Amino acid sequence: MTIRLSDEARQLIAVFETETDATAVDCLPDDDRVVYVVTAGEMGAAIGDGGSRVDALEATLGRSVVLVEDAPTAEGFVANALSPAAVYNVTVSENDTTVAYAEVAHEDKGVAIGADGTNIETAKELAARHFDIDDIQLT
């Protein structure tokens, strides 16, 4: 699937890759935060010792930074997008629409949803961009 990046997203990815020595495959900029999809296996490099690289990136951008690890499957990607919530299982159902059903620990549903639904909406947008998933439902 081809992902279209805005000029701002391309610039933010360039800053990310310079600051972290990790590779980002997607970026969702917002007024107060930037969400990066990091190549699978590069999260440690992106975070840095004790979060040092993320802290430096946040200082450079003046916004909070959220990292999501890429995954080869829709199920893995949805689980990563809902992190740090404990996701036990993800099932993708394809009928008229494609829906990912994520089994999340009861005590982590608030984390998966986020303040004002921010986390779940971001996960839905990323899942749509990367795997043509129309919706994510928490179970």
UniProtKB/Swiss-Prot annotation:
Q: Where in the cell is it found?
A: Cytoplasm
* Span of domain KH: 31-97
Keyword field contains Protease: no
Q: Keywords assigned by UniProt? A: Cytoplasm, RNA-binding, Transcription, Transcription regulation, Transcription termination
* Spans traversing the lipid bilayer: none
Please cite one Gene Ontology biological process associated with this protein.
transcription antitermination
**Mind telling me which Pfam families this protein's record contains?**
KH_5
A GO cellular component entry from the record:
cytosol
Q: Which molecular function terms from Gene Ontology are attached? A: RNA binding
Q: Does the keyword Transcription regulation apply?
A: yes
What family does this chain come from, according to its entry? Belongs to the NusA family.
Protein role: Participates in transcription termination.
Q: What is this protein called?
A: Probable transcription termination protein NusA
State the species of origin: Halobacterium salinarum (strain ATCC 700922 / JCM 11081 / NRC-1) (Halobacterium halobium)
